Amino acid sequence: MFEVPLLLVIIVLAALIFDFTNGAHDCANAIATVVSTKVLTPRVAVGMAAALNLIGALLGTKVAMTLGGGIARPDVVVGSHILVLAALVGAISWNSITWYFGIPSSSSHALIGGLMGAALAHAGVDAINGGSILGKVVLPLILSPLGGFFMGILAMMLINFAFFKLARPIANRFFKKAQVLSAGLMALSHGMNDAQKTMGVITLALLIFGEIEVFAVPLWVKLTCALAMAMGTAVGGWKIVRTMGHKIFKLEPVHGFAAETSAAMVIGCASLMGAPVSTTHTITACIFGVGATKRLSAVRWGIAGNLLIAWVLTIPASALVGGISFYILEFVTGLH
């Protein structure tokens, strides 16, 4: 039989492990294009991404509020000490599988799926916050890649119009410098959205265990989540960088600038609205959009099929693992 305080420590550690895998998996999105175009070395890019993720993570808590209370109803799950741990097991499992195979699926989808599966296992459909999950979670997750695709097209068209008289080598020299700024904006927006998701999960656990009385993200939660994500970026992001930066479309600095700027705008706006979106979906869609403006054959559309399968499977797969994990933990710990 587990003591409740020990279980809370385990949950917080599991959440930070998820954040670490998120850094290894999703934070590569912030630096994939700037590394693949050789504007920055991997070491410099990782350092920049880590610093700006830390800053971004401290800029708000709206996304954390949505993740903590917009998926599972706090009034229903408040008595379940194992729910958050089961959700994290589902998310971490799927993240690990897709990371191993170098597939840029969505950690956001994995976390949402894990929470949904564990909540359903605990109390059925009554545990799901139906009204909030549609408007603040499902629609943004669907619309953000569509917005990213068309923003990528629009950004590239505007750049082509503004610089059409400039020779490509000269333009690329300019955008090599500009891409440092766009990569920084992408890293900042990533911290604003993705780091807050784990903050929301940990804060929900603190609320369930009675460590806090109202849903408010403590400063130590913000800092530890930001640091865990930065460490994950440094350790494991390069498999995803290769897929994002080379396999989809052969990127030049101008393309990297357009894709990063477009993605940063979409993700930043979503963060200000408190919408947890997929940074993976968004930057990938931006790269597809940018590539499509050159010529359709320049984009390796075959990659899209593999990515689409992973994206479609992520929520149900992580929900299934989250639900099974809940029942296993319930049996092992004797808790609910």
Protein language model features and the residues they cover:
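Multi-pass alpha-helical transmembrane bundle typical of ion/small-solute transporters
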Residues: 1-336
